[in-house]
């Protein structure tokens, strides 16, 4: 620098440090874009248990683009012979009942006790105004989210009724083909008539809270009579007595809504 010459004895300028680029170099080279995959590529990756390709396949299935739907249909048809070998559990309940937190604890217990691989399909409600969805159920599953043998896929309901997403059945097929032998389906927060999940799973678990209604609410036909098991959650602290009362009320309700005598053991 000329400022370092003799006539500028009181001023010294050092060479600066080059700043790194803030642009991703892969983006600059054009490598960031995903390669267009064929149906065969998807199927090959799914059968190998590649969760990245599995996630992309689920996105493809959920897409409303006609071109994507054509490829998705071919992928599902090729994965179908490899599906049907899992244990499917549906978890439903009112908003705030603790479905996601319960899945986190129960899922870790299942993986530790029985091994295998677990897929969790968490359905979040979509906004009627913006059509968007937060997809925040995964944030409640802190342990499962980092477990190497688990796969958590949040999906928007996209206006679908019944507590599940439009393509939940197809997503189950893909997960089974990828080698997941245990699948949990978490519905959106439901009311009394959202029972679509029941027909998709082997065991349908209903999570309830104490103080959400009396016996009259319980004997109303709907989701209560479809549940294979009922759990009264958040039974601790000052809530123990209320939960015990709620369990008694639900057992009494099952006398009117169920035919089997052993159904009284469904409430815990």
Language model: regions and residue ranges:
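Non-catalytic terminal/linker segments enriched in charged/polar, low-complexity residues
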Residues: 1-81, 113, 241, 246
